[in-house]
């Protein structure tokens, strides 16, 4: 049944804050299993509530529901039927695993306390986790800790990976406009060339990473777009630098943002140009908490054995908006290995089975493993006296 749900969700992907069908399926299933449901938290989010015993302790288990704006090239039976939309990050599987756990917990209730089942919208850049928090997630559903999980291609099928402390990086965007003075390209002395100034700024910024930041603290500053000009014989009025900054600590991020602006302003002023400096902090670093990570490791080892749990995985510079929940509550986020793609049925797109790839598919062999982890985590965190 859970596999059928997963494949149905894969065939009907919905983008962030558009997960109406998905949320309806989730809520209907939970209610059919006798689980009270709150709908519409954070626009399309769903929270299920399973109580047992008399303890006031509570934990949250979170799964994301949204898809990506991509055209799937797989040709198997459960491929996307919605043009330009695809579950290329496995959120269909995340939703299904939490539903599987919900069904078991509702039937057996071998815990003392409350388990909140958090089905989150809009993880893919929409900030759905933050939106649910702003909509009262932790006030309306008070919990002691919150947990998340993500499938991870390249890690052996059915193995877990986690690290105490920083697990994923912050995600930040900058958009910096250099304003000069346009001129004929044959008479550059009559203008102020914003392209030349922008290039100087871009080169200087990289010294923040190589010469100003502590080399033991990881960070990335990538310029991914440069926009300027419209003709070969015109020096434009402005040039724009766009890109991303990733860090594992806010202290390093503070340094980078401050020095980027100082360098941009100073270099531009030296050439008679000006700068409009835009820097947006999107997702904070995802940092696991020690006590909850220990609970998670205990639960993972109980499900797959100690040899299949890597507790020293290398953090990734990718970002996750579950970080907002871990800022508000203690908790832990883990990776569950999706394998190398051998699980895909015939008719797949022949490309790599990587996240955000048009040939990706979630590994259904993970469904019982992920669901069992959620169950074990609930029973470990909320033991019956």
Residue ranges and their predicted role:
Residues 32, 199-385:
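Metal-dependent amide/peptide-bond hydrolase catalytic core
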Residues 12, 189-195, 251-257:
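Active-site pocket-shaping loop/turn-to-helix segments
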Residues 1-87, 96-99, 103-111:
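Acidic/His- and Gly-rich active-site-bordering loop/insert found
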Residues 46, 68-70, 74-86, 92-93, ...:
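Histidine/acidic-residue-rich, glycine-tolerant segments that coordinate divalent metal ions
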């Amino acid at each position: 049944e859970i596999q059928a749900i997963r494949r149905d969700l894969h065939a009907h992907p919905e983008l962030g804050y558009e997960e109406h069908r998905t949320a309806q399926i989730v809520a209907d299933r939970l209610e059919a299993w006798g689980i009270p449901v709150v709908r519409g938290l954070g626009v399309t989010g769903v929270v299920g509530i399973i109580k047992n015993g008399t303890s006031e302790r509570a934990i949250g288990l979170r799964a994301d529901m949204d898809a990506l704006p991509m055209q799937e090239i797989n040709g198997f039976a459960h491929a996307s039927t919605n043009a330009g939309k695809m579950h290329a990050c496995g959120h269909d599987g995340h939703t299904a695993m939490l539903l599987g756990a919900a069904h078991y917990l509702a039937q057996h209730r071998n815990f003392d306390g409350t388990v909140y089942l958090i089905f989150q919208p809009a993880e893919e850049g929409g900030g759905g986790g933050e939106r649910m928090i702003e909509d009262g997630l932790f006030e309306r559903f008070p919990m002691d800790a919150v947990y998340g999980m993500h499938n991870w291609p390249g890690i052996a099928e059915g193995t877990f990976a986690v690290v105490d402390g920083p697990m994923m990086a912050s995600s930040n965007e900058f958009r910096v406009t250099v304003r000069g003075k346009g001129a004929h390209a044959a008479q550059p002395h009559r203008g102020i060339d914003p392209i030349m100034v922008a290039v100087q700024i871009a080169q200087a910024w990289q010294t923040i990473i190589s010469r100003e930041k502590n080399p033991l603290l990881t960070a990335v500053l990538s310029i991914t777009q440069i926009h300027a000009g419209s003709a070969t014989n015109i020096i434009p009025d402005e040039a724009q630098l766009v890109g991303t900054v990733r860090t594992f600590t806010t202290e390093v991020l503070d340094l980078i943002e401050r020095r980027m602006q100082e360098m941009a302003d100073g270099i531009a002023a030296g050439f008679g140009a000006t700068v409009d400096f835009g820097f947006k902090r999107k997702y904070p670093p995802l940092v696991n908490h020690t006590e909850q990570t220990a609970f998670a490791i205990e639960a993972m080892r109980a499900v797959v054995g100690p040899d299949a749990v890597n507790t020293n995985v290398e953090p990734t510079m990718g970002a996750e908006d579950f970080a907002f929940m871990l800022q508000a509550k203690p908790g832990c986020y883990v990776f569950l290995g999706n394998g190398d793609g051998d699980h895909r049925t015939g008719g797949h797109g022949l490309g790599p089975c990587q996240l955000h790839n048009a040939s990706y598919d979630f590994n259904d062999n993970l469904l019982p493993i992920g669901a069992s982890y959620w169950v074990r985590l609930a029973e470990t965190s909320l033991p019956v006296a």
